[in-house]
Amino acid sequence: MSASVIKSWADAEDEIPTPEITTNPDGTKTVVSYRLNANGQKVKITQKIKEVKVKEKVHPLIAQRKNWAKYGKEKNTPPGPDTRTTQLGEKVELKLGTSWKEIEKQEEESKEEQKAQLVSTQRIKCRTCGGDHFTSKCPFKDTLISDSTDASNAATPEPADDGMNAPGKYVPRHLRKDANGNMPAKDLKDRDDSTTLKISQLNSIVDEDMLRNELLGRYGPFQRAIVVRNRETGESRGFAYVTFATESKAEEALNDLNGKGYHSLILHLEWSKKRK
């Protein structure tokens, strides 16, 4: 490195020699060049270069197309695309073979794992109405069961008390008498549902918040509002149960909304239990 400092860049162009290229016996080339650094000092750079030829095997037709004579604005240009006249598209890799079956299988397995994780982290859901409580504590358990069992209960007479106590006959625990000879209280049957309405023909997009805030907002407050959902998919089954604060509010909602349209469907409102 030279210690002299060049004061003028114009003088530097005259003093910097041209690069020297020397061919070595081993086939490499030694290139000696000079340049100026940030301090204006002349720096000597020595590079040893080895030329390597890489042969690429392509289809004969592809090699033939590369040797075609170019025309128009590309006339007399070297082989290959010119970025001044050619816009390069996205590179697409085409993989041929049977490995795509294995890839699809791996994707399906990953989806199954995600579903399993989702089920494991899912919140508590009632198997009867789909609400966020235990099935044994479902407030509408007797109502939902009665919808499907009313016909069978009407055709099947209740067994007599004497038959219950007949020796050798099994009596369910909930039908056995206690130590004082009294039958157990039927809490669900005796529960007061005088302020509960069943709303059917609901659109599948309707949830509990839409019931409270949109459809029944002016009839609130509510003790509970539950949209009955499918046990497996979690989708709405098209009806819900809403318990109002007073019987008058429930009757007002029944008279105002029964037969009205809501999200492209005609609502049907009725009392959750037949009134005497």
Swiss-Prot record:
Q: Which residues cross the membrane?
A: none
- Answer yes or no on keyword Phosphoprotein: yes
Question: Which coarse location class applies to the principal site listed for this UniProt protein?
Answer: cytoplasm
Ranges for the RRM domain?
A: 195-274
- GO CC terms: eukaryotic 43S preinitiation complex; eukaryotic 48S preinitiation complex; eukaryotic translation initiation factor 3 complex, eIF3e; eukaryotic translation initiation factor 3 complex, eIF3m; multi-eIF complex
- GO BP terms in the entry: formation of cytoplasmic translation initiation complex; translation reinitiation; translational termination
Record keywords, A-Z:
Cytoplasm, Initiation factor, Phosphoprotein, Protein biosynthesis, RNA-binding
The free-text function statement in the UniProt record for this protein reads: RNA-binding component of the eukaryotic translation initiation factor 3 (eIF-3) complex, which is involved in protein synthesis of a specialized repertoire of mRNAs and, together with other initiation factors, stimulates binding of mRNA and methionyl-tRNAi to the 40S ribosome. The eIF-3 complex specifically targets and initiates translation of a subset of mRNAs involved in cell proliferation. This subunit can bind 18S rRNA.
Q: Which family does it belong to?
A: Belongs to the eIF-3 subunit G family.
Annotated protein name in UniProt:
Eukaryotic translation initiation factor 3 subunit G
Q: Organism source for this protein?
A: Debaryomyces hansenii (strain ATCC 36239 / CBS 767 / BCRC 21394 / JCM 1990 / NBRC 0083 / IGC 2968) (Yeast)
